[in-house]
């Protein structure tokens, strides 16, 4: 089944792939079966609802898979290509046939005509719409940029100035969004601005209006204040307080009722005015100016923030909101005096609160100053006591240190003296014992000689054989003992000679030379001595592999190093090129000190180090150079390392020489 499903796709493959499929099919089918055998072995299957009628129908049926077409490059003829096996019929129930057929249809005839060539591949779709996509992306990007810019302009004042000044149409977009937001939050603001209070008029009477009469400028100012109150979003309104909105609604209802009553009074008085004559109604305009159509309203100014107290500021906001509501009302003249009095009382209360607050601040400031002075006095006293205690402790520690150091020095001196005296006494006693032994031996020898002569004279030579044998044994024992003493002395002398060879190799060399051979000779001569092994192990491998400089070379290198240190003596820790140049120029004009100097500057340290090197005290010179700081210490790092190696080698040689002397004294 897998092979039959792959067969239609072979037409789209290349000749190489087709050849591979053909070879694979040849491997899978070792022999070609005839169509009759195929038809007898496995019945053919047709789709549901179709039946085989003719051989042409079977040959042209698209549901029947055709064998793959051979490639033009293939050498296998089409007749030898095996056909794919037909699919098995599907049985719905046991014992039933497929589509009511009892006999399989005859197999299709096999023809030698090659199959038609495969259709050419469809052409690749042309890439188009690049300009259209570019325009769409550009429009979307511009829209998103403008939307983001407007949103940031509403959030940040700095970006608002930049966006409205440098971006085209940025100011119009921001204004449009702000206007829509304002209209959404205050839908009745424009209605209140355009509203005008107009008194009812009588349509049935003709009235001549003088030129200077009419609406006064104060009414316009009141309308302007109303407009400002309506457009000021920061003030308290219905969007900030629901209680004030209810109060405003009640005031509006009251004003509406009063307007209705006034209108009824005007309508009742209208018939009486119609009965009057025209001469009484029409008056000259220059004799008496008419009152304005709308009475002027004296608005009450809002309170200013007198105190920074949050409670007082909240009360001030409440009173200002109340004043704004009353100023917006048409009948605010009734509350003007009351509001003015309340405003004056509130201002006086604010001044009193400010005075009390100032007094409290002054009193607190005085208390703070007193507390600060007391704190400073206490802190100074505490610091003084701490300094005294610290000075006493330092003096006590210094005395204890000096006494302990003197005690340890005296103890070590006494110990060294005792050891030397004991070694001298042991050596003298050993010499005396040796002399006594030699005297005894001489006496014994003399006695033996006398006895031998006597025996010789008396008994002859045979009587002296036993004595001679005993004497020979004693002489051999004495010879062995003296040989060990001689070997020890010889080994000690060789060790001393090897140490002198190392020292001469280090002191007489003009350039640093390795002294591995000399050090190996010293180690072989003292192979069983742990002190000598420890001293040799303390020497750095770099020292005996590369050599160490001589004192003259150390002094010469120090003089070259001192010049560089003087150049870098004025550099800070994080110096740049300018600092290096300035330090180099300043080093040219610096005077070199001579003699002993007790200062801590770089020049004094260099002077003391040079004097110590001339005296041969390398240890103290290294300590002086190690006290440098900054770039000076960095430059002298290599020189200090060489001096340390020289001191390590020198100390090791001194230890080896001391151990050799002690071995000479310990010989019995």
From Swiss-Prot:
Gene Ontology CC terms, in alphabetical order: MICOS complex
Polar residues bias: start-end ranges: 90-100
Pfam families membership: Mitofilin
Biased composition (Pro residues): 79-88, 103-125
Assigned keywords, A-Z: Coiled coil, Membrane, Mitochondrion, Mitochondrion inner membrane, Transit peptide, Transmembrane, Transmembrane helix
Residue ranges, Mitochondrial matrix side: 30-133
Extent of the transit peptide: 1-29
Main subcellular localisation: mitochondrion
Biased composition (Basic and acidic residues): 221-235, 250-266
Claim: Cell membrane is one of the keywords in the record: no
SS bonds (residue pairs): none
Transmembrane segments: 134-154
Ranges in the topological domain labelled Mitochondrial intermembrane: 155-668
Keyword Cell inner membrane applies: no
Its membrane topology: Single-pass membrane protein
Region Disordered: start-end pairs: 30-49, 54-128, 195-284
Compartments it resides in: Mitochondrion inner membrane
A GO BP annotation: cristae formation
Function: Component of the MICOS complex, a large protein complex of the mitochondrial inner membrane that plays crucial roles in the maintenance of crista junctions, inner membrane architecture, and formation of contact sites to the outer membrane. Plays a role in keeping cristae membranes connected to the inner boundary membrane. Also promotes protein import via the mitochondrial intermembrane space assembly (MIA) pathway.
Quaternary assembly: Component of the mitochondrial contact site and cristae organizing system (MICOS) complex.
Protein known as: MICOS complex subunit MIC60
Organism: Uncinocarpus reesii (strain UAMH 1704)
